[in-house]
Amino acid sequence: MLMRWHHPLRQAIGHAVGVTPIVCKNTDFLSVCEYKRGMGALDRYLDEQLSRGRAYFSRNDGSLALGLGLEAFSAAATRLIVKRRLANPRRGFFLILRPEDQIIGAPDPVRWIDPLMKYLQIDYRISLLRAAAFHGSTHQAAMVFQVIAPRQLRDFNIGRHRIQFVYQGPTAFAEINQPDWLGQIKSAAGFARVAGIELTMLDAARYFRKAAGIHGVAQIVKDLGAKASPRKLAEAAEHYENTSVRRLGYLLDQANHVRQASALEPFARQAKSMKPLSPSLGQVPDSLTVLHDKDTKWKLIINEPLETEF
């Protein structure tokens, strides 16, 4: 689809800076405009993207807009990365840095995680500590931005941000990542997909090592448990390991979130053996289980006392 550049103000600006957008077209990723080459054309392309509310673009779209080969475009982009005008979180994907972004090296990831994952063609959800903070767990200072995805991706740092990808098997992910169990985080750049309260707690119980350990999970459950729908919690729990569900049920009980805990009791009745509350301390030998309290309702060995005050 082609769209001629007729707006007189933009034409005037384009001629004044020595680069004229000559045609716009829609691509699968975003709308791009072709420019006549000229000194600083990439800089002006970035300004135009920002004026249209887009703080990101792909290498292919940028090179197409400027009429440059990929090698020439990459060289120009590298110069702007050095000048801290651009950031490059993934090969072929660029972030445009506004002056306020340059201080910390990149915008808040919630502004660009959705277009990045669309560029990579991978479904996702923001979860764990960042999702808990979004839903109101004020104790969660989300120093890391955690994303659950059905493919194994490398973590990376960009500016002061740490992006951590948590792998979930494709089958389980497809069953869990359903609209009824997800929410949206709105930012100036659009929307990003986030785990709902129920998934946030289940993910924290499942990936507890990445949620500040069992004590971090306990704090999340204390803060968010009352807001969870018992129905959604029980439905989503069908797709998680039984031990993780029992761990969450126990913590809900400790926090006196009775309705939510009751929704998970059927999972405890299915359990065949006792499991440690905190597997990070290792399996508890049978000879040492007498040293720990046991919760027979949830079939858990309480091998780590909780520090959270419920």
Indicate residue ranges for each PLM-predicted region.
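Short, intrinsically disordered or compositionally biased N-terminal tails of bacterial proteins
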Residues: 1-38
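Hydrophobic alpha-helical interaction segments
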Residues: 26, 181-310
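Short beta-edge/loop segments at beta->alpha junctions of small alpha/beta modules
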Residues: 33, 38-123, 229-231, 235-239
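Hydrophobic/aromatic-lined pockets within catalytic cores
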Residues: 67, 81, 136, 140, ...
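Pocket-edge structural micro-motifs
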Residues: 98, 149, 167, 196, ...
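Short acidic (Asp/Glu) patches
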Residues: 110-115, 132, 147-149, 178-186
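Exposed, interaction-prone assembly regions rather than primary DNA-binding/catalytic cores
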Residues: 124-177
